[in-house]
Amino acid sequence: MFNINMEIKEKSITTFIGPSGCGKTTLLKSINRLNDLIDGVKMSGVIKIFDKDIFDKDIDITKLRTEVGMVFQKPNPFPISIYDNVVYGLRSLGIKDKKILDQICEESLVKAALWDEVKDILISPALGLSGGQQQRLCIARAIAMKPKILLMDEPTSALDPIATLKVEELVLDLKKDYTIVMVTHSLQQATRISDYTGYFLKGELVEFNKTKKIFTNPKDRRTENYISGRYE
């Protein structure tokens, strides 16, 4: 990837758009260094989160990934109970106090707009939930770690329109507390929920601006071609 230079505003929603293979997800996973897990990946440049370069030698990777949560394209609840899914990360950090776990579990499910639907079945298997519920559970699991940033890689691509709407409404609500960066192939979704949009093509950030400006007055011809359906 190249020509990547942007400032993501705190407590905003930023979407990355562009054709498949243009580098959207690669960049997204760079923000919490998930790309480190891929053999042969090389990185040059700087990514700063709150004025700290995440590639500095003294960076605590575990802490970084706690502060920068990730929600993947396909809902991926663990094959355990709903409750255990939400508190899984907390337990891995050594938190064992049941009152604390119960409180954070409820808070996270409330924020994920799922509490009312599952509060009476917390011990039930998470895999028994619908696809939309599973994705909101995964968001609750990420929220439970109290991140500052939420990364979302096409979080509604595997969901039906009704479930998609619920997740979009949730994301808009979460913006009050979190900075959200999302990859989407849906231009309509980008216009509905994002404050800022970056258009990527062949590994290059072609244009980055407020979403309204990207879709109504793009500066680059390549951006205009893509959003008008003339991309080849």
Curated annotation (Swiss-Prot):
Give coiled-coil spans as residue ranges: none
Keyword match Ribosomal protein: no
User: Which superkingdom, per the lineage?
Assistant: Bacteria
Q: How does it sit in the bilayer?
A: Peripheral membrane protein
| Keywords noted in UniProt | ATP-binding, Cell membrane, Membrane, Nucleotide-binding, Phosphate transport, Translocase, Transport
Q: Localized where? A: Cell membrane
Known SMART domains for this protein?
Answer: AAA
EC number(s) on record? Answer: 7.3.2.1
Is the keyword Translocase in the record? Answer: yes
Q: Where is the ABC transporter domain?
A: 1-227
Q: Which reactions appear under catalytic activity for this entry?
A: phosphate(out) + ATP + H2O = ADP + 2 phosphate(in) + H(+)
- A single GO molecular function, which one? ATP hydrolysis activity
The principal location of this protein is: membrane
Q: Which residues form the signal peptide?
A: none
InterPro entries the UniProt entry points to: AAA+_ATPase (IPR003593), ABC_transporter-like_ATP-bd (IPR003439), ABC_transporter-like_CS (IPR017871), P-loop_NTPase (IPR027417), PstB-like (IPR005670)
Q: Give any Gene Ontology cellular component.
A: plasma membrane
The role this protein plays is: Part of the ABC transporter complex PstSACB involved in phosphate import. Responsible for energy coupling to the transport system.
Oligomeric state and interaction partners are given as:
The complex is composed of two ATP-binding proteins (PstB), two transmembrane proteins (PstC and PstA) and a solute-binding protein (PstS).
Spell out the protein name for this chain. Phosphate import ATP-binding protein PstB
Organism annotation = Mycoplasma mycoides subsp. mycoides SC (strain CCUG 32753 / NCTC 10114 / PG1)
| Encoding gene per record | pstB
